[in-house]
Amino acid sequence: YMGVVEMYRATGNPRYLELSKNLIDIRGMVENGTDDNQDRIPFRDQYSAMGHAVRANYLYAGVADVYAETGEQQLMKNLTSIWNDIVTRKMYVTGACGALYDGTSPDGTCYEPDSIQKVHQSYGRPYQLPNSTAHNETCANIGNMLFNWRMLEVTGDAKYADLVETCLYNSVLSGIS
């Protein structure tokens, strides 16, 4: 998403912007899609953070780029709701996110043994933020920072800058060894 929008910005070729919009539109079109791959439901129906945290955060950052170019209000509505869900219910004070290393999707389970969706390195249920088993992969935290950076760019709201700083100095910097 982000790379395709950057190609559009660099070349001015509208096919790249169209491709980025199509990549959002295909979310949820896969039969038996999963939270892990961000394709269980259409993006425009998503109002909470779900699934693999790296894929999720990079998707959210890319959607913010598409919003910056198109101004589609539905995308901002989704992004704002997802951001609020992350910040108020699925993020540690360090800015870290993606608490679960391994588990089952809190939303994509049909309660039939062969269709329970497994997730890894993912967002869990609201307030499911364990101490001793927190995964909080560095890549997810970089994605969180990229998502907040783009939200700052499109809104100018300092709350996004605050989280860029929180993530950078805590959950991202700690990944450097």
Which residues make up each language-model segment?
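Glycan-recognition and catalytic cores of secretory/periplasmic carbohydrate-active enzymes
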Residues: 1-177
